[in-house]
Amino acid sequence: MIASSKMLLSASILIYFLLNLQSSSAEIADCSFYDTVDISEGQRLSNGSYLYEGLLIPAHLTAKYEFKLLANGDKEQVPSHVRGCVCKLRTCVRFCCPHDHIMDMGECYANMTTEENELLDPMLNVTLDDGSVVQRHYKKELMVQWDLPKPCDDMFYLDNRDIMDEYTLFENGRLLRHYDQVYLDKSEYCLQHRTFGEGNNNSIRIIPHNCLILPSRTGQTVVMITSLICLVLTIAVYLCVKKLMNLEGKCFICYMMCLFFGYLFLLLDLWELSLDFCKAAGFLGYFFVMAAFFWLSIISRHYWKCLTNPCASMNIRSERAFLLYSCFAWAMPLALTGVTYLADNVVNNEEWQPRVGDEGHCWIYTKSWSAMVYFYGPMVLLILFNITMFVLTAKHIIDSKRTLRKIARNEGRIQKLNSDKQNYTQFLLLFTVMGMSWSFEIFSYLVQREKLWVNIFLVADYFNWSQGVIIFVLFILRRKTLVLFKKQIFPKQRAFSRSATQSTIESISQTKRHFNMT
């Protein structure tokens, strides 16, 4: 009898222990962690149910949890707390931070001020299961979930005032991103308040934040690194060959250096290697791209001036001309960079801000019309200037050649004109390459709201990234440059060739004299 009592007591203790163990580690049946809320601060009723923020949660929809879910799906041990499957009872709205926080650049900032609370628009458009759209107060009519893990570290927000950023929030918590027609569940986005500058007035709205869309970077990386290597090789050849270090060659080297650093900062941004100095990298990249355009404009004007007015160009020494060109080609992009920096810090309206370093990209923001003012606008003007210079130069070459043929057969002048024409044609190809690639970039910016055109202009992007390769092929892998490079690298071989030729001539002369004497 005593033994039976002991066995019964042991079994009761074991069952009690197992039940407690199960309840402490159990999850709510048929309820995702993303549909739960920590209700530990709610009122527990005698029947095991909870009263939380005016909502009665039955006991079978509650459980003790000893973990929290991480963004990658792993579980992290935390102190025991009670969670309720509230999203089965009321429409939930998934926040990134507590409801009285503001998010900016992916970071939460605590405790909104009274003034900020007055600016807050608390209403959300929610699409019901029947397709109708209703407005709901985020705090009074919805259940706020704020203790769920952030989807990722680098997030960007959707501002539905922009057609590219339109979205639909559904009653079941899913979000439709209109741009690419992708449905996101609550593990892939979160909502939070954000301050928007609108002229002299600010507003605070609840907007979704989702993870950055990162396409494959392999192709772009390979093309850009190859392009950078080709630019370095081209610069090295020009620095090595003395005959290429004329005024045009020096300007061309400056142009390639600007292109090199512009691409370098783009590559650093692509691989998120410039986040520690994001704004500085964005402004430096902007400066070098603008400087490349100004150096190309210098080259086009130089050829126009030399061919249309050779006397005037001869009066200016090469060193002095290069100094003047340098002052202009470096000062103008520096001034544009200064204006852009000033606007980025002074202008309050986001539509007119350059927003360098915004949304995790260390570059000028290209999704608004402000990019046309600070980036693409100056680019268009410089492209038009270059077109004008090259057209005028081409017209002069054609007219001059026609005139020389009519007047007399001045072989010297015709030969010089042909040489000038070859140099001009070479730089015309350079301008065509750069002008076309950046023109495609501008068109891509203008039609970025159309998904079809975005895919089409992806080819143009690769063309743009490969400019270094094209320059190397056009300017280095041509017979004239290769011959000059060979002579510069192997001067002894040239001397030996001359010596051998002279010895051969002398030998032939001696043989002739020998036969004559005979």
UniProtKB/Swiss-Prot annotation:
Source organism per UniProt: Drosophila melanogaster (Fruit fly)
Pfam families xref list: 7tm_2, Methuselah_N
Gene Ontology MF: a single term: G protein-coupled peptide receptor activity
Cytoplasmic membrane side: 242-250, 301-321, 393-426, 477-518
Gene3D superfamilies: 2.30.160.11, Methuselah ectodomain, domain 2 (2.170.180.11), Rhodopsin 7-helix transmembrane proteins (1.20.1070.10)
Main location class: membrane
GO biological processes: cell surface receptor signaling pathway; determination of adult lifespan; G protein-coupled receptor signaling pathway; response to starvation
Membrane topology: Multi-pass membrane protein
PANTHER family, A to Z: G-PROTEIN COUPLED RECEPTOR MTH-RELATED
Family assignment from sequence similarity: Belongs to the G-protein coupled receptor 2 family. Mth subfamily.
Residues of the signal peptide: 1-26
Glycosylation positions in this chain: N47, N111, N125, N201
Protein name: Probable G-protein coupled receptor Mth-like 2
Subcellular location: Cell membrane
Keywords noted in UniProt: Cell membrane, Disulfide bond, G-protein coupled receptor, Glycoprotein, Membrane, Receptor, Signal, Transducer, Transmembrane, Transmembrane helix
UniProt keyword Transmembrane helix present: yes
A single Gene Ontology CC term: plasma membrane
Residues annotated as transmembrane: 221-241, 251-271, 280-300, 322-342, 372-392, 427-447, 456-476
Entries under PROSITE patterns matching the protein: G_PROTEIN_RECEP_F2_4 (PS50261)
Topology Extracellular: residue spans: 27-220, 272-279, 343-371, 448-455
Disulfide topology: C31-C85, C87-C92, C96-C190, C97-C108, C152-C211
